[in-house]
């Protein structure tokens, strides 16, 4: 269905664009979990994420701290709540980050609405997503009522916008949620004209 509204922040950017290649499925290999998540919590709080949101994500097994490097790991779950995707990010100043081997991009890190919702918010990273949830909380808006998906890093789109492909995470979500009629792009450094092409493809 056509998307009625596409809104970004000050700038709007087309989401992750990549050409999916058929390949044998590899089982997801999750980083070893630390028994203590204090470094991960401290890092996320230093990024301005609300402690309550961090705790809820950790309680729901969406975020944990890994060993031996104490990275923050963001988990994407399938419909049966099984881990299918993992993105790790260093808790120091090195900006170390990457995807765990076997990650399925259909299930990137997300927070789904707990009630009926026709809106979908797209973010470049899990940190951006959590920051937005925190802003909603600060405004006393219930972030549990919004669908939010991280695109796990934005790939450089083709110069020929019409040839770009919608990220599989969005395709899958829209397939399972046909009621979505508004998509909000919270992405960086983009030309507004690209949003028009993106809208047509949905």
Residues of each region from the PLM?
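Short, small/acidic-rich helices and loops at N termini and domain boundaries
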Residues: 1-5, 60-62
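Non-catalytic accessory segments adjacent to catalytic cores
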Residues: 7-10
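Basic, glycine-enriched DNA-binding surface that flanks or lies within the catalytic cores of DNA
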Residues: 12-105, 110, 114
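Phosphate-handling DNA/RNA-contact segment within nucleic-acid enzymes
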Residues: 67-175
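Acidic beta-strand-to-loop metal/phosphate-binding motif
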Residues: 122, 181-193
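Short active-site-adjacent structural elements
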Residues: 158-160, 192-197
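Short, aromatic/basic amphipathic alpha-helical patches
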Residues: 173, 194-202
């Amino acid at each position: 269905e056509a998307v009625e509204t596409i809104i970004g922040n000050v700038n709007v950017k087309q989401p992750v664009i990549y050409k999916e290649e058929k390949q044998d499925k590899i089982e997801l290999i999750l980083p070893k979990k630390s028994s203590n998540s204090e470094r991960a919590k401290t890092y996320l709080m230093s990024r301005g994420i609300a402690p309550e949101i961090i705790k809820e994500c950790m309680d729901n097994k969406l975020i944990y701290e890994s060993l031996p490097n104490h990275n923050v790991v963001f988990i994407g779950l399938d419909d049966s709540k099984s881990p299918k995707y993992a993105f790790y990010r260093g808790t120091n100043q090195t900006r170390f980050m990457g995807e765990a081997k076997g990650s399925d991009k259909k299930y990137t890190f997300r927070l789904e609405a707990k009630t009926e919702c026709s809106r979908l918010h797209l973010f470049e990273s899990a940190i951006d997503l959590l920051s937005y949830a925190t802003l909603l909380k600060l405004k006393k808006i219930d972030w549990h009522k919004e669908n939010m998906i991280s695109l796990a890093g934005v790939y450089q789109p083709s110069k020929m916008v019409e040839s770009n492909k919608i990220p599989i995470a969005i395709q899958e979500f829209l397939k399972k949620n046909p009621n979505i009629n508004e998509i909000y792009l919270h992405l960086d450094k983009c030309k507004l004209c690209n949003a028009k092409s993106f809208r047509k493809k949905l």
